[in-house]
């Protein structure tokens, strides 16, 4: 499968955001694609992919805090027996993928943007995929 990359992460926190931008940059270089798109995909129902600010670590903290306020980890009204309903809601809100434009061998991101793998039900070993398409 040309230009499909699989990556593994060992997540040791219950809820966290891992910057995966450099990994994706390396995939683009390895692919040799100069113009096209890159899709970053998370195949898990309690994790997601987002693009957000990279300059202030407080942004990551605040995102996790905000998701926890919206979808608390502990809620006696949840019915899902595994106890991770909050993580399913957070990942559904976050989304499972992001698509970016590749131009001149680099993807286009805003000045303060990076790509994050978002874990809401750790600790776990996780995978994500990067698909690079020329054109």
Where do the protein language model's features map onto the residues?
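Active-site histidine-anchored catalytic micro-motif
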Residues: 1-135
